[in-house]
Amino acid sequence: MQKLFMILIGCKPKGRHTEQHDIFFGVAAQLRDLIPEMLSFWPEAEGDMHVDGWREVTQVDGQDIKVVGRTDVVPANQKALFFINLGGYKKDEFEEFHYKMVVAAAEKSTAIKAAKQTAFFKHTHFDGANSHIDDEYGVDVDDLYRIE
């Protein structure tokens, strides 16, 4: 059975002073089946990367998530999945903090509204250093697999 995985990859590319991270989404039967795709996803790592965290995405915002084939019929009112990476700051801390989330919504603007309602967005800022959305991507089910 195919599953949708959300994976936090860590790596310290050559010439960098700190470990860096990125999020990878993949569809496979098991996490280890995604290793070749993860390696090609971040070629600058030159194969020297690790998994810092992962989850099988089975439910988002009360919606059950199921991977189906591209040719399967999906209802027209089906919501899409959006990955949002929020960034914010705390007074007297030399760091940009992040909060990653997956939102089920009919459109991108609705997903962004949901992100702006989180405690992170509302409280991780101070004058001159506002919370913001670093990245906002739709997990485009048409380009991967339809998800219901």
Can you annotate each of these PLM segments?
Residues W42-K79, F121-E148:
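Short, mixed-charge low-complexity intrinsically disordered segments
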Residues K3-M6, L31-I35, Q59-K66, K79-F83:
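A short linear-motif detector with a strong N-terminal bias
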Residues R16-D52, E93-H132:
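Extended intrinsically disordered, low-complexity coil regions enriched in Ser, Thr, Gly, Ala
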Residues M1-E19, P75-E96:
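Short aromatic-glycine-(Arg/Gly/Cys) micro-motifs in beta-strand/loop hairpins
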Residues I7-I9, I23, I35, I65, ...:
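Weak global preference for isoleucine
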